[in-house]
Amino acid sequence: TLLYMAVNLPPLPELYPVPGIRLGTTRAQIRKKDRRDLVVIECAPGTQAAAVFTQNRFCAAPVTVARDHLGQATPRALLINTGFANAGTGQEGMDDALQSCAALAAILGCAPQAVVPFSTGVIGERLPLQRLIAGLPGCLGAMSDGGWAEAAHGIMTTDTLPKGSSRRVDIEGKTITVTGIAKGSGMICPNMAT
C-alpha cells in the first residue's frame, strides 16, 4: 500500500476577501457523498477575466464551452464541479456543460454565456447533471465574500490539501487584494498540453 502525503507544505493561509467576488460551496454528491464538490464563484458586473487553457486539440467539453463563453460575455459566475471531468464525453458532455451553465444563469438572472464552467475528476464519464443542478441552490445559499477556504476544499480531487494564497498591497493610496486558489499541478505537464 502506498501512502501519499504533502511534505513541507504550509497550511492554508488566511485568504482575504476580494471586493466584488462571492463564493459558495456545497456537497452536491456529484461523486462522493461526504465532500464539497460544487463551487460557484460569483463576479460583480463589470468584472474582467483572463484565462489560460490547454494547448491540446482534444479537450474536455467545459474547456470548449469556457473558451467560447469568455469570448462572448463578461463572466458573472464560475461554475466548478469535482468528481467528473466531463472529458471524452462527446456531444452529450457538451450538452451537459451548456445545460449546467444555463441552469445557473437562470437562477442568477444572467445570460448562459456569462457562466464559465470548469470540471475536474474522472474522465470518460458523464456528469450527473441533475445532482449538479440540484446543488446550485446550496452553493448560492452559502455565498459569502469570505468563502475562499471552503472553495479551495471544494475544487480538490486527489489533492492532499487545499492550496491558496492572498496578498494585500497599496498602490497609489489604494489597497489592492489578490487572492487565488489552486489545484494540484501534475496534470498540466507537458507545457499545458493535457
Residue ranges and their predicted role:
Residues 21, 38, 61, 78, ...:
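A broad, low-specificity signal marking well-ordered, structured residues that form hydrophobic/aromatic
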Residues 15, 30-32, 55-57, 72, ...:
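A generic structural signal for short, solvent-exposed coil/turn residues
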Residues 41-97, 107, 187-194:
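Glycine-rich phosphate/pyrophosphate-binding loop regions near the starts of catalytic domains
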Residues 98-194:
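Glycine-rich, mobile lid/loop segments that gate access to catalytic sites or pores
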Residues 14, 18, 77, 82-84, ...:
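N-terminal hydrophobic or amphipathic segments with adjacent small-residue motifs
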Residues 2-54, 58:
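N-terminal amphipathic/basic leader segments beginning at the initiator methionine
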Residues 19, 23, 82, 89, ...:
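Short glycine-rich loop/turn motifs that provide flexible caps or phosphate-binding loops at active sites
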Residues 23-25, 32, 54-55, 65-67, ...:
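Generic structural "secondary-structure junction" signal
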